[in-house]
A protein has these predicted regions:
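Thiamine diphosphate
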Residues: 1-121, 128, 164, 362-365, ...
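Gly-rich Lys/Arg/Thr-decorated short loops/hinges at beta-loop-alpha junctions or inter-strand turns
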Residues: 10-13, 33-39, 95-97, 122-128, ...
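Flexible loop/turn segments at secondary-structure boundaries
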Residues: 24-27, 52-53, 75-77, 101-104, ...
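Flexible, low-complexity linker and terminal segments
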Residues: 1-2, 152-384
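Structural motif
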Residues: 14-16, 41-44, 64-67, 90-94, ...
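Core active-site phosphate/anionic-ligand binding loop and the adjoining beta-turn-alpha structural block
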Residues: 89, 97, 103-175
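A short acidic, amphipathic alpha-helical/loop segment
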Residues: 31, 55, 80-81, 146, ...
């Protein structure tokens, strides 16, 4: 997965990477250090994660397509520069390869404990975020390309969320060799010649403007304070209203620009139970759903890929939902409970550092459909 992300970044035009080694994203930095010089790019190892993302912001302001990568303990250190990039509308791509927590946890075990951190990566509020979740090496490559596209289209940092099993795993991938093959595979890339224009635009949620304005040899005037339309600091509430409105609604009002071909529904014909997941658990879930249907259970699956902004539109059906996550505290399940119709049942099955087994999943499907209480490993799981 790490090497697939590297190839996806290079396909998208990435020519700058800064990072700090952390398992399970270290191999991505290693492969970037090898591949970027081969294509005329720049690799820098920073003194910490905070510095790494600031370096990427500086590179992006200078016209580079830039990227950084880390795991949960390092993503926390992105809080300051992530907010800076959001407020200054600076396009770059961030990979987070999740490992089990809290804190350092186990470096070689997968986790999904940063679901909400991807939505709220910095302080202050008044912004929207975009996050894509992959479940294979092939998707790691494809979604990295897509993340660069979205970052320039929306002028903001975009995150790719994976986990240890995906980024450390090895699978065959199909790499396009030219632009025609990229288009055939559904990849979208903004060519550099369209990324020109004035430094700043009026506060609006419209996107009929050049998607990014960087690298046109005039410098970029940026401020992490509330800016005027020319980029200077100002302390006026009306100006802040315009600025915050744009940061939120340029995303919310233009979700149709996301590549919804990536959304995956599986055996979704009027099921009694819809199993919701993302990342590595979705691979086990799909297999379990197929086996359960062979046994006569009406079960369907929904795998989320565009996880932020959260796709409320997928949860209009009044039915039973089971959310499967790589954590015990429950994060995705809270959003499903919020988005699902109020008379729907939403259940939770979590695991901590290990994947649920097929027998455990099928047993859980049966219990939810029959309204029996859920148990696992002796622990009573809370009903949401």
């Amino acid at each position: 997965g790490n090497f697939a992300i590297t190839e996806g970044a290079i396909l998208a035009g990435c020519r700058f990477f800064a990072g700090y080694p952390i398992t399970p994203a270290t191999e991505l930095a290693e492969s970037m250090s090898l591949r970027l010089p081969q294509v005329g790019g720049v690799y820098l190892q920073a003194e910490d994660e905070c510095a790494a993302m600031h370096l990427c912001i500086g590179a992006a302001l200078g016209g580079y397509k830039a990227m950084t990568a880390t795991s949960g303990p390092g993503f926390i250190l992105y809080a300051d520069p992530y907010g800076w990039a959001l407020g200054c509308e600076t396009p770059l791509v961030v990979l987070n390869s999740g490992r089990v927590g809290p804190v350092s946890g186990i470096t070689g075990a997968p986790g999904q404990g940063e679901f909400y951190l991807m939505r709220y990566p910095t302080q202050g509020g008044n912004f929207e975020t975009i996050c894509l979740a992959a479940n294979s090496a092939q998707e790691c490559m494809a979604m990295t390309v897509e993340a660069f596209y979205l970052s320039e289209r929306f002028r903001m940092p975009v995150s790719v969320l994976a986990d240890q099993l995906i980024t450390d795993g090895f699978e065959d991938i199909s790499v396009p060799e030219n632009e025609d093959e990229m288009k055939e595979m559904g990849f979208r890339v903004w060519p550099r010649e369209v990324c020109r224009g004035p430094d700043f635009y009026p506060a609006t949620d419209e996107l009929d403007i050049p998607p990014v304005v960087l690298g046109h040899n005039t410098g970029a005037l940026c401020s992490d304070w509330t800016p005027t339309e020319e980029g200077y600091d100002i302390e006026e509430v009306e100006a802040h209203h315009k600025h915050a409105y744009r940061l939120i609604y340029k995303v919310r009002n233009n979700k149709h620009l996301f590549n919804h071909l990536y959304e995956k529904k599986y055996m979704d014909d009027d099921p009694d139970l819809v199993v919701v997941s993302y990342g590595t658990p979705s691979r086990v879930v799909n297999t379990a759903v197929a086996k359960a249907r062979q046994q006569g259970l009406k079960v369907g699956a929904l795998r989320l890929i565009n996880v932020w902004p959260f796709p409320d539109e997928h949860f209009t059906r009044r039915t039973k939902y089971l959310v499967v996550e790589l954590n015990w505290d429950g994060e995705l399940v809270r959003e499903v409970q919020r988005a699902a119709p109020k008379d729907s049942e939403v259940h939770f099955l979590g695991s901590c550092g290990d994947l649920p087994t097929l027998p455990a999943l099928i047993e859980t499907f049966e219990k939810v459909i029959k309204d029996e209480p859920l148990t696992r490993k002796g622990w009573e799981l809370e009903e949401w």
